[in-house]
């Protein structure tokens, strides 16, 4: 499997919900990363996987079984939905529902938290493009006070990543809005 499109992600999430609903459960996820960029921002056509954190830890084993079943049904890797990005997650802000179907609700973090995660990761051109899109959508085309914006992002930076994220933010701000 290479990349998951919006349609494929929605199909898989819908199926997860069907399976949960059949057992009188509702799965609540906080999606991050590429899946949010695909589902909420239409910023990309596809992503490698769905990074999400289960908001009901008691259902973790249940969710793993369902994810495995959906993977088998679709011929996907077992880790198509995983919590690998949780190391970049500092708390859980509310950016709203980005997908819902019977048995499943998928939320996104607020833009400041998504941007904090992208700045902390800052691995490749994909992260940089995503961060630029998030910044432009959140702040607008004219910018503003970059220190005020940073103060909204900073609480979501994982300890040990602050310097990297700050430099990434300043670099991003300059490339989008200039030196002001």
Task: Put a short name on every predicted segment.
Residues 1-180:
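Compositionally biased terminal segments of proteins
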């Amino acid at each position: 499997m290479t990349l998951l499109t919006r349609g494929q992600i929605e199909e898989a999430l819908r199926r997860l919900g069907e399976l949960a609903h059949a057992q009188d459960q509702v799965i609540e996820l906080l999606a991050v990363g590429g899946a949010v960029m695909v589902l909420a921002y239409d910023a990309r056509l596809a992503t490698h996987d769905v990074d999400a954190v289960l908001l009901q830890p008691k259902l973790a084993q249940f969710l793993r079984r369902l994810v495995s079943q959906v993977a088998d049904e679709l011929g996907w890797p077992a880790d198509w939905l995983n919590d690998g990005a949780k190391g970049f997650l500092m708390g859980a802000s509310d950016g709203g529902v980005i997908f819902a179907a019977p048995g499943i609700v998928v939320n996104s973090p607020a833009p400041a938290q998504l941007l904090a995660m992208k700045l902390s990761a800052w691995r490749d051109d994909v992260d940089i493009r995503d961060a630029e899109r998030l910044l432009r959508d959140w702040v607008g085309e004219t910018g503003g006070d970059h220190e005020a914006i940073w103060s909204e992002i900073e609480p979501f930076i994982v300890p040990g990543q602050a310097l990297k994220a700050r430099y990434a933010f300043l670099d991003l701000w300059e490339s989008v809005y200039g030196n002001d």
